[in-house]
Regions:
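A non-catalytic alpha/beta surface segment that caps or lines the substrate-entry region
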Residues: 66, 73-126
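Short acidic/His/Gly/Ser-rich catalytic and metal-binding motifs that mark active-site loops
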Residues: 140-146, 196-200
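Active-site-proximal beta-strand/loop segments in catalytic clefts of secreted hydrolases
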Residues: 68, 102-104, 123-124, 134-138, ...
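C-terminal motif of bacterial Sec signal peptides marking the signal peptidase cleavage site
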Residues: 27-30
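Acidic/histidine-rich catalytic neighborhood of metal-dependent amide-processing enzymes
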Residues: 153-227
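Extracytoplasmic/secreted proteins, especially bacterial periplasmic and envelope-associated proteins
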Residues: 60-67, 79, 83, 87-94, ...
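N-terminal capping segment at the start of a domain
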Residues: 33, 38-84, 95
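Bacterial N-terminal signal peptides that target proteins for export
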Residues: 8-19
């Protein structure tokens, strides 16, 4: 599946650039210096952030988004889902992360058993000061919000809602490996089974819609695997 340079793709690049600004804070929030007022007799000082850390490459993040989409929709219990899982794990390991998986059989709103895998990738695992960065990696199996009703029961490619968030984290891992910040550790978590919420065309289970989303992150929160 080839992703064309469309408006959606430009939006993904813009999103990745915005995440880079956010990550600037991760690498500066613990680094402070002092600036002194030039007026004689004024001893007040203010803390300033010293810019450190790697630069973010949105083109790399876009390539990682495309690579995930090339597997096809990563819907639960599918071959594309399983292949993408192995690809994500391999990329984080390639960029120096300590990787573990959190597997669980989660029950969907209609009783379907979802073979869920949360992927946890850690940089600098011995660091006490840590930052948690999360995104989900599964695709929604139904495009139930598509303006074209003929697509409502077709799976979503999930480029900008799924793949792009994971791509940003992989790019951050790559940059951190190249220019590490020894006093800070990052815990990247790729949540699974997030997008299996009750579709709008389903009338039988609408009373369960609130509890049918974000199954992987709920499981993670209740069964924290991180020490």
């Amino acid at each position: 599946t080839e992703i064309k340079e469309t408006k959606m793709n430009r939006n993904i690049k813009f999103f990745c650039s915005g995440i880079a600004v956010f990550l600037f804070a991760i690498f500066t929030f613990s680094c402070k210096g002092k600036a002194t007022n030039n007026n004689a007799g004024d001893s007040d000082t203010v803390a300033v952030a010293k810019p450190i850390g790697p630069k973010f490459n949105p083109d790399s993040a876009f390539a990682y988004t495309e690579a995930q989409c090339n597997f096809g929709p990563r819907t639960m219990n599918s071959s594309a889902h399983d292949k993408c899982e192995q690809w994500i794990i391999a990329k984080f390991k390639q960029y120096g992360c300590e990787v573990q998986t959190q597997k669980a059989d989660l029950k969907a709103y209609d009783g379907t058993v979802l073979k869920s895998t949360n992927i946890i990738a850690r940089t600098n695992p011995k660091a006490q000061q840590r930052v948690l960065v999360c995104a989900h990696w599964d695709s929604r199996p139904w495009a139930d919000n598509d303006p074209d009703s003929t697509n409502h029961k077709k799976p979503v490619m999930a480029a900008n809602d799924g793949a792009s968030g994971v791509a940003v984290m992989i790019e951050l891992a790559r940059q951190i490996q190249a220019d590490s910040v020894p006093n800070v550790g990052i815990d990247f978590v790729c949540f699974d089974a997030e997008d299996w919420g009750v579709p709008q065309w389903e009338t039988q289970y609408q009373d369960q819609s609130g509890d049918s989303w974000a199954l992987g992150s709920n499981y993670f929160a209740k069964n924290l695997p991180l020490a």
